[in-house]
A protein has these predicted regions:
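Structured beta-strand-rich core segments of catalytic domains in phosphoester-bond hydrolases
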Residues: 78-161, 246-248, 252-256
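Active-site-proximal segments of metal-dependent phosphoesterases and phosphodiesterases across multiple
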Residues: 159-184, 202-216
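Active-site beta-strand/loop signature of hydrolases that rely on acidic residues for catalysis
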Residues: 40-48, 62-90, 119, 144, ...
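Active-site environment of divalent metal-dependent phosphoester hydrolases
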Residues: 51-53, 84-87, 109-111, 163-166, ...
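Soluble or luminal CAZymes and related metallo-dependent hydrolases
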Residues: 54-58, 85, 136-138, 173-183, ...
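Sec-dependent N-terminal signal peptides
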Residues: 7-16
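Metal-dependent phosphoester-hydrolase catalytic domains
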Residues: 26-33, 129, 187-195, 201-280
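N-terminal, active-site-proximal structural segment of metallo-dependent hydrolase catalytic domains
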Residues: 2, 14, 20-96, 108-113, ...
Length: 280
């Protein structure tokens, strides 16, 4: 996420507005303890702060089990603000592991061309970019499909508008992100399970239309309460719609790995894992 001046003041205003808007939030499930055994899939969404983040360090910690307790069966990284100038390093990181990578540039900030990327330990099929309605800057999502235990899942990395319209009907408005969320959802399969991660810039909290729209479509998503950015803001999310009998847990990684955002880690457990009681 990129900011101009006055970030602290803006954060305070947005947190107040979020508290007022929270009564309209979508229902998310509350989870108990995770099932025993290693996860079948580890999914991380992370805004790399215009390429400044230490991606090799993050991948190393995932592979060595420091973040997931034990090495996960497979890994999918959903990255935002990767930069075209370092795309070769991204592809090299994937190539030496036999992984797949897809990067689509979207915005040039005068120094670097930023974009979204997917890196997957599973073969990534049908990778493409999806252009979103433009507000202040160009925005897109990247998507593709992977297969886990003979089950196909779509995966998406996206980055929504980071500004709001002020004082519409007396409140800050999230119309721009709402329009982008609607456009992205129209492009995604409706009869196929999938995972969407990204920097949704949900400054106004759970009552934001983008948050509610994705929570409704991806109703296996664990509750998101831990801040991912300064000022106590929850901007980054992993939304999941899983096959019958699968389950997931989500947590925010304490280390930012030189970015200004915390990575968000979702562990997906296949149908052979013990299910957990959950309330919705």
């Amino acid at each position: 996420m990129y900011f101009g001046v006055g970030q602290s003041a803006l954060s305070a205003v947005f947190l107040l507005t979020a508290a007022l808007a929270g009564s309209g939030c979508a229902t998310a499930r509350a989870l108990t303890a995770p099932p025993p055994g290693p996860a079948r899939l580890a999914v991380v969404t992370w805004n790399m702060n215009a390429g400044r983040g230490d991606l090799p360090g993050l991948v190393r910690d995932i592979e060595e089990g420091r973040l997931v307790g034990a090495p996960a069966g497979d890994v999918v990284l959903l990255l935002q603000e990767a930069v075209q100038e370092a795309a070769s390093e991204l592809h090299e990181l994937a190539a030496v592991r036999g992984w797949s990578a897809f990067f689509a540039p979207v915005h040039h900030d005068g120094a670097r061309r930023r974009g979204n990327a997917i890196v997957s330990s599973r073969p990534l099929h049908g990778a493409r970019a999806i252009l979103l309605p433009r507000e202040r800057q160009p925005r897109n999502a990247v998507t593709g499909a992977i297969a886990i235990d003979d089950q196909e899942l779509f995966v998406v990395s996206t980055h929504l508008e980071n500004r709001v319209s002020w004082w519409k009907a007396g409140f800050a408005s999230d119309d721009a992100r709402g329009r982008q969320a609607e456009a992205l959802l129209r492009e995604l399969p409706t009869e196929m399970p999938g995972i969407v991660g990204g920097d949704f810039n949900t400054w106004l909290g759970p009552g934001e239309s983008a948050w509610r729209l994705f929570q409704r479509r991806f109703d296996d998503t664990p509750t998101a309460e831990t801040p991912t950015f300064s000022g106590g803001l929850v901007l980054d999310h992993v939304f999941v719609d899983l096959p019958e009998g699968w389950d997931a847990t989500t947590r925010v990684i304490p280390d930012r790995y030189r970015s200004d955002h915390h990575p968000v880690l979702t562990l997906v457990y296949g149908s052979n894992a013990s299910s957990r009681a959950a309330t919705r």
